[in-house]
């Protein structure tokens, strides 16, 4: 008998002991019987064992509302450029920069004072400008202005911080002998020796540099903005930089000066409640800061031109017009072609119809004044700045109002904290999901009501939601990120006919396909552990075997992403619209072939099964099963749809544009791809980065050295440098051992080399020499005599000698930049394991969005091709659809009639529901005829259509189907990669006729057709570009117009059909599918093709003997291949 204390601290007698066992799956201790719980096992696998945490990370959350007491300063600018012919091509240089200041009045006043310190700065109306055609001069002056802003506001942050902690800072300055509080190291504020404090109204500063299309144009031309001099900034604040060039644009180039916030509370009991209402308090911020951000309004308006953005957001200002080529010629050559009034001629204007308007505008604003193209360009540039500034303020106020009114939050929102629409809509979604989750948890068990105890003992307290995570949404991490992205398959885009189609063609598209798909159920909860995942795979295989049709909303089926094998039905049951695509062969191909080792969602599994495919789910260690379905995005998308409909009724163009963009961009946010490459400046290398490079876990893939004329520096000419061999220069470098006139150097502190001159060399003759004359004097005299005679060069006409003297040499000037090498060196770091650390994006949601969209298309396929099944796919009359493009189908006349009869319930009406209804589960989507008659609003068709390639087609016209109308409207040309203004329907038709002539070996009278356009060749940090980093050059791009060559379908008769088992994809016919050995550990390994992995003749004989030998007499043998 033992005695021990129980959980309440009381002494108790232990009368008996029973051995217990611990479950390896869920960790629970048991004596007799035990059954694991899914949730407990998942938690034990992820949180306790830590195995799952290497594959999944809880999506991190931080309230996107704006921090209190933040003041904003906006610097809105625009530049005008001209081209210069250089050795590498036509390079663009800025010659004019206009900017305006807005925001907090005190900050604007201080910034204006700093701007006026430049004596070359001029004012125009409410703005300022620089005008200088020397390369790099305008950029240098703008850089100096921004540097003065950074230094001024960083020092002001330190001064205000020190004023709130005067005693502590004065003591540090005194003890450390620092010249000022700016010199105090940041670490002494991060880990203070005495408590610090800040007033509740202590403010931070956001300085936003704004422009339209500056991330792909202006900021690249102003390359000097990339260089920082850290020695000019106060040491008391920490300087961090976010630098991310991506996809031809500078996505991030932000700098933040921060100091620790002593009021920060790490675990605040009220944080969950406040953040659920969209309120951020001063104790939520880890730092107080001055933040410099570069934001492009083009990225915040979904790539709309400034003129269209101004109209979309109902601005009372409009963008002007400018003859760019005339300005370029004038700046480059000093003249341009003008008419009798001195106005640029018609060829300079993009739209000649505006010439009269621009003339009247000039005469109205400048009566009696001769046309000045530079002044007109200046006013145009300043007008662009004015429109951009108005657009920026409209965006800021409108998104703030949207955050409060439509999402129901109580705080404020600053759209410029994040650079793009996808990043902002992702933040909105996380905020709304977090708020809904907190509300659900509070409704289930309020904080004041403890959960009733299940057993005798302590009352179990309900765990409250964490403010650091978004509901129960997890992001694939490291190896799982790569695996999940295999289920991310793109949209449908291919024609089923090449060339002209001379019958009616109707265009239908799904209304808001991604928005509708987002409202359907998505995976939610912590992924199951391998044991329960395997059990669900077995259950799913049983359902696929025993039942011919399965509902997408069957309660027995859990959301999952699995590896499968799928075998198609007979050719009589196949359709020209396959249910899924494959990347085998290196191309994304929509195919009816058998699928092997494909990673798909359970939605795709059910779609394949219901279309007659035989699907088998494979057991794989990377298979993922989630515990439950939940409409995670439905609330957010529904709010956007309702806001758009409300804006339509109220004629509010601003809210309409915002709600439409946010819905369309949410899917793209979930599908964000990441890699293991980072691009940073050498001066931003952290100690962790240096350690990883030293240990070899990270490597430097590429080094880019920045150099540009706009960088600040000093010109040095060698011809003005002193002669290094003169007596004066030599005296500075050498000291005679016995020179009494030579000043003795100051004694070193360590006392080395005192009084010992015996070992020092002397250039003079020693006093105790045996000879009076220097032994080298004779040699010197001989050398001087030889030099005086000069070289032997024959005289006459045959002589070609050059007699230039050394002192006549012209040295090339050298420029010494005012920056450290670390500030000019950009490193490309790459992780060797190639695994992405992800805790932001729930990529599986994007996979399910595409899965639901494929389910929509599968139902659409049933509408069009259901009656044709049972007839071989090649023996049917004609396809009901001719072209598919992501969310649209081009259908024939028979396909249109089937849409009106069999698919009438899927054609959108005023009462059609486009969002998922949990009370009545089903697929919710609708489509409509894309091109409507402008006269009566009825459907239209094209009497003749030509298809040349994916995203290259033409509709000749649009004829109304209404017999009483029959209006003939314009057609439609789609020409990806070509300048659309140069193409008409007849041009596409001529291209096809030439293709037919060449195909049949004839000599075509039609010349090869092509389109030309001038492009801006942007070079950021490209390793293989012939251009310098951060430059923009003009190039003429010529593209040949020709039909599709690399087909992803097979041709039969007049139509194209998807590959099937009878007509396999030629790109994959040579692939060998190896069967993995037992215990293989790399499920992500690509398919290997080993052409020499076959049996030899001797091995074939051994196999034959084993197969036909008598079992009683044959001994066991092993054969290794």
From Swiss-Prot:
Biased composition range(s): Basic residues: 455-464
SMART domains, A to Z: POLBc
Keywords: DNA replication, DNA-binding, DNA-directed DNA polymerase, Host nucleus, Nucleotidyltransferase, Transferase, Viral DNA replication
SUPFAM superfamilies recorded: DNA/RNA polymerases, Ribonuclease H-like
Pfam families per UniProt: DNA_pol_B_2 (PF03175)
UniProt-annotated stretches for the region Disordered: 443-467, 736-775
EC number(s) per entry: 2.7.7.7
Subcellular location(s) per record: Host nucleus
Major site of localization recorded for this protein: host cell
Substrates-to-products reaction catalysed: DNA(n) + a 2'-deoxyribonucleoside 5'-triphosphate = DNA(n+1) + diphosphate
GO MF annotations in UniProt: 3'-5' exonuclease activity; DNA binding; DNA-directed DNA polymerase activity; nucleotide binding
Residue spans of biased composition, Acidic residues class: 739-759
Any one biological process term the GO annotation gives: viral DNA genome replication
GO cellular component annotations of the record: host cell nucleus
Subunit structure: Heterodimer with the terminal protein; this heterodimer binds to bp 9 to 18 of the genome. Forms a complex with viral pTP, DBP and hosts NFIA and POU2F1/OCT1 for initiation of replication.
Family to which this protein belongs: Belongs to the DNA polymerase type-B family.
General function of this protein: Eukaryotic-type DNA polymerase involved in viral genomic replication. DNA synthesis is protein primed, and acts in a strand displacement replication. Assembles in complex with viral pTP, DBP, host NFIA and host POU2F1/OCT1 on viral origin of replication. The polymerase covalently transfers dCMP onto pTP, thereby initiating complementary strand synthesis.
UniProt-recorded name of the protein: DNA polymerase
UniProt source species: Fowl adenovirus A serotype 1 (strain CELO / Phelps)
């Amino acid at each position: 008998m033992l005695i021990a204390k129980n959980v309440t601290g009381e002494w108790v007698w232990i009368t008996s002991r029973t051995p217990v066992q611990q479950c390896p799956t869920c960790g629970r201790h048991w004596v007799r019987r035990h059954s694991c719980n899914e949730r407990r096992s998942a938690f034990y696998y992820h949180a306790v064992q830590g195995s799952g945490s290497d594959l999944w990370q809880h999506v991190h959350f931080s309230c996107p509302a704006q921090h209190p007491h933040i003041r904003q300063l906006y610097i809105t600018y625009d530049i005008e450029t001209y081209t210069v012919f250089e050795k590498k091509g036509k390079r663009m240089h800025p010659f004019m920069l206009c900017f305006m200041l807005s925001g907090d009045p005190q900050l604007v006043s201080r910034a204006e004072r700093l701007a006026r310190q430049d004596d070359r700065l001029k004012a125009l109306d409410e703005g300022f400008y620089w005008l200088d055609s020397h390369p790099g001069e305008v950029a240098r002056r703008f850089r100096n202005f921004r540097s003065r802003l950074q230094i001024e506001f960083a020092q002001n942050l330190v001064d205000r911080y020190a004023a709130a902690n005067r005693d502590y800072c004065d003591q540090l300055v005194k003890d450390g002998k620092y010249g000022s509080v700016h010199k105090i190291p940041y670490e002494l504020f991060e880990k203070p020796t005495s408590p610090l404090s800040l007033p509740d109204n202590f403010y931070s500063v956001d300085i936003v540099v704004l422009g339209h299309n500056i991330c792909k144009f202006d900021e690249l031309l102003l390359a000097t903005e990339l260089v920082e001099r850290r020695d000019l900034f106060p040491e008391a604040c920490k300087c961090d930089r976010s630098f991310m060039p991506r996809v031809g644009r500078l996505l991030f180039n932000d700098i933040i000066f921060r100091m620790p916030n002593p009021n920060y509370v790490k675990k605040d009991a009220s944080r969950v409640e406040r953040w659920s209402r969209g309120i951020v308090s001063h104790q939520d911020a880890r730092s107080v800061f001055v933040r410099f951000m570069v934001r492009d309004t083009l990225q915040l308006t979904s790539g709309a031109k400034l003129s269209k953005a101004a109209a979309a957001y109902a601005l009372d200002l409009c963008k002007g017009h400018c003859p760019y080529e005339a300005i370029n010629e004038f700046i480059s050559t000093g003249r341009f072609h003008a008419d009798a009034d001195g106005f640029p001629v018609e060829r300079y204007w993009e739209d000649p119809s505006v010439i009269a308007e621009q003339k009247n505008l000039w005469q109205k604003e400048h009566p009696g004044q001769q046309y000045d193209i530079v002044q007109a360009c200046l006013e145009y540039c300043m007008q662009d700045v004015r429109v951009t500034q108005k657009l920026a303020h409209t965006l800021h106020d409108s998104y703030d109002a949207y955050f409060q009114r439509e999402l129901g939050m109580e705080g404020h929102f600053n759209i410029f904290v994040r650079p793009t629409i996808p990043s902002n809509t992702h933040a909105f979604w996380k905020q709304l999901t977090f708020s809904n989750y907190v509300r659900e948890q509070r409704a289930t068990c309020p904080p004041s009501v403890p959960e009733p105890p299940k057993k005798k003992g302590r009352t179990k307290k309900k765990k409250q939601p964490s403010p650091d995570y978004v509901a129960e949404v997890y992001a694939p991490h490291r190896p799982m990120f790569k695996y999940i992205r295999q289920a991310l398959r793109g949209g449908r885009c291919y024609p089923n006919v090449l060339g002209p189609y001379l019958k009616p063609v109707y265009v239908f598209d799904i209304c808001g396909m991604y928005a509708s798909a987002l409202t359907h159920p998505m995976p939610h909860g912590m992924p199951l552990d391998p044991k329960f995942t395997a059990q669900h795979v077995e259950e799913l295989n049983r359902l696929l075997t025993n039942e011919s049709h399965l509902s997408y909303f069957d309660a027995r089926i859990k959301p999952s992403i699995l590896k499968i094998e799928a075998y198609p039905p007979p050719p009589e049951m196949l359709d020209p619209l396959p249910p899924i695509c494959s990347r085998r062969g290196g191309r994304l191909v929509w195919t009816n072939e058998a699928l092997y080792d494909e990673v798909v969602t359970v939605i795709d599994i059910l779609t394949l099964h219901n279309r007659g495919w035989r699907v088998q789910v494979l057991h794989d260690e990377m298979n993922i099963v989630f515990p439950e379905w939940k409409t995670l995005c439905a609330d957010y998308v529904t709010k956007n749809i309702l806001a758009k409909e409300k804006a339509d009724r109220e004629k509010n163009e601003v809210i309409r544009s915002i709600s439409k963009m946010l819905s369309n961009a949410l899917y793209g946010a979930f599908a964000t791809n990441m890699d293991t490459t980072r691009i940073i400046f050498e001066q931003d290398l952290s100690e962790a980065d240096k350690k990883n490079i030293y240990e070899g876990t990270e490597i430097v893939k590429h080094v880019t050295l920045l150099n540009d004329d706009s960088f600040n520096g000093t010109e040095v000419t060698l011809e003005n440098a002193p002669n290094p061999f003169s007596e004066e220069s030599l005296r500075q470098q050498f000291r005679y051992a016995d020179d009494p006139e030579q000043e003795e150097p100051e004694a070193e502190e360590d006392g080395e080399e005192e009084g010992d001159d015996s070992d020092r060399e002397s250039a003079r003759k020693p006093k105790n020499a045996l000879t009076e004359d220097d032994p080298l004097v004779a040699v010197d005299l001989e050398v001087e005599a030889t030099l005086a005679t000069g070289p032997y060069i024959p005289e006459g006409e045959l002589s070609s000698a050059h007699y230039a003297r050394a002192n006549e040499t012209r040295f090339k000037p050298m420029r010494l930049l005012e920056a450290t090498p670390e500030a000019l060196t950009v490193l490309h770091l790459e992780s060797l394991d190639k695994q992405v650390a992800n805790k932001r994006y729930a990529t599986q949601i994007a996979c399910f969005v595409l899965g639901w969209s494929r389910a929509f298309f599968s139902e659409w396929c049933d509408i069009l091709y259901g009656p044709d099944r049972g007839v071989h796919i090649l023996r049917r009359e004609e396809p009901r659809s001719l072209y598919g493009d992501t969310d649209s189908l081009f259908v024939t006349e028979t396909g249109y009639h089937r849409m009106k009869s069999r698919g009438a319930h899927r054609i959108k009406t005023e009462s059609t529901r486009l969002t998922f209804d949990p009370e009545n589960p089903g697929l919710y989507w609708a489509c409509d005829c894309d091109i409507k008659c402008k006269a009566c609003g009825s459907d239209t068709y094209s009497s003749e259509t030509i298809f040349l390639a994916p995203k290259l087609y033409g509709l000749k016209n649009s004829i109304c189907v209404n017999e009483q109308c029959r209006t003939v409207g314009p057609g439609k040309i789609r020409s990806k990669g070509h300048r659309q203004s140069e193409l008409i329907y007849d041009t596409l038709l001529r291209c096809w006729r030439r293709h037919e002539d060449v195909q049949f070996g004839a000599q075509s009278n039609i010349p090869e057709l092509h389109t030309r356009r001038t492009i801006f060749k942007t070079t950021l940090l490209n390793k293989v570009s012939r251009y310098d980093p951060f430059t923009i050059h003009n190039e003429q791009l010529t593209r040949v117009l020709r039909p599709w060559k690399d087909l992803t379908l097979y041709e039969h008769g007049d139509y194209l059909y998807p590959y099937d088992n009878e007509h396999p994809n030629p790109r994959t016919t040579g692939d060998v599918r190896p069967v993995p050995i037992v215990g293989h550990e790399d499920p992500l390994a690509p398919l290997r093709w080993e052409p020499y992995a076959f049996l030899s003749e001797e091995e074939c004989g051994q196999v034959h003997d084993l197969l036909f030998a008598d079992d009683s007499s044959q001994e066991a043998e092993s054969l290794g291949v």
